[in-house]
Amino acid sequence: MQINGGIRFCEQGMKASIRAMHVQSEVLGMINENVTGFDKVGFQRREPVISAFTEYLGIHGLSSTIDDAPGRIMTSQNPLDIAMANKGYFQIQTPEGVKLTRDGRFKLDKVGNLLDLEDNPVLSDAGMPITLPVLPENATQVVVNAKGKVSVYDKESNELLDAGYLGIVDSNGMAVLNPDVKQGFNEYSNVVLQNEFMAVKPVVRNFEANRQIFLLESSNLQKVISQLGSAS
């Protein structure tokens, strides 16, 4: 739009800058979520995916994907803490359905059911809750091998009794054949703080550029309104 006096106002430019700032705010939110999750067990970072049409779609052109790379594995000394060196997810039966998670901090109840920290059953490769055939005197009598096979020491027979395999699957629900299970370890997030901080810079720079466009167009709009008022 141009009126007498040569003042130009681009409505589309203002709308585009608003949409862009909205998208960049959401991207910053994802980065902040990743940084916040740095020290969380089983946390996986989110990667923003920006559509080629985001300029027109705004926030509807933004999506995200989960980075499924393994995180940092650290010893915990708790035999019921289970981590995976390869990709995959444990299956947990919740009231809302089966949940996939990398958080392998488990515990036993009084009858030998293997549970997560929220008392939800851990599922086997057969899709059933894992229950130990005998109740161990302590957690050190529970053995989990690299394939995810769970066993428990039976004092009476002096041998290990099988309790099944952990139901480890990929994001599509397909069985993972070589999860490389680590007993007595926790897996912390796969977030690399340096990468997240580096990712902030271009987002902030783009946000500031669009903010300047918005302020310029907003100023021009005020001038247009003022001149239209003077002409009436």
How should these model regions be labeled?
Residues M1-S232:
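Amphipathic alpha-helical polymerization modules
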